[in-house]
Amino acid sequence: DWKPGTINDYEVNEYRKCEVVYLSQDETLERNLKTRKKIDEKLFNIITNNLQKYLKKYNSLGYIQVAEDTGYMLLRYKTGDYVKKHVDTSSDQHRTLSCSLILNDDYEGGEISFLDGKVKPHLKKGDLLIFPSSFTYPHQVLPVISGTRYSIITWIR
């Protein structure tokens, strides 16, 4: 079931306007266990393979330590939906890396924006964006102009 999206587990509606299905929690997990396990395995493999490439490229000094992902969230952004500028870690939720898997590209707008709009990676269906969750990487999802944007997100601890 689709629920209103949140930021860092806080319901702050003025910051995020989209809908979410928590793929790794509670009733969604129990109701669709067999299918969910298959999806989880595929997502885990996609993210792990790309994470290894990311760490090989950006972690030559070994500063980034990773242990696990936080589970997966399916996000749906309809026309007009957005996420305002925020970071993905907080004092009570340590996250090292953020991951966003783009599921479609048949929409307009909805870009992930860094550095107050100076950096907007052009993402296509199947792309996985990995970036630090820390205060040095505030980001936002710009409003969807038309269509519906779908993505799956997780965080690496």
Where in this protein do the model-derived segments appear?
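Non-heme Fe(II)/2-oxoglutarate
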Residues: 1-64
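Eukaryotic intrinsically disordered and solvent-exposed regulatory patches
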Residues: 59, 86-87, 137-139
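Short beta-strand/loop turn elements enriched in aromatics
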Residues: 88-105
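Catalytic core of Fe(II)/2-oxoglutarate
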Residues: 80, 95, 106-157
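Acidic, glycine-rich loop-and-strand cores that form catalytic or ligand-binding grooves
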Residues: 61-76
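Conserved short histidine dyad/triad with adjacent acidic residue
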Residues: 74-91
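A structural signal for short, well-ordered beta-strand segments
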Residues: 72-74, 99-101, 152-154
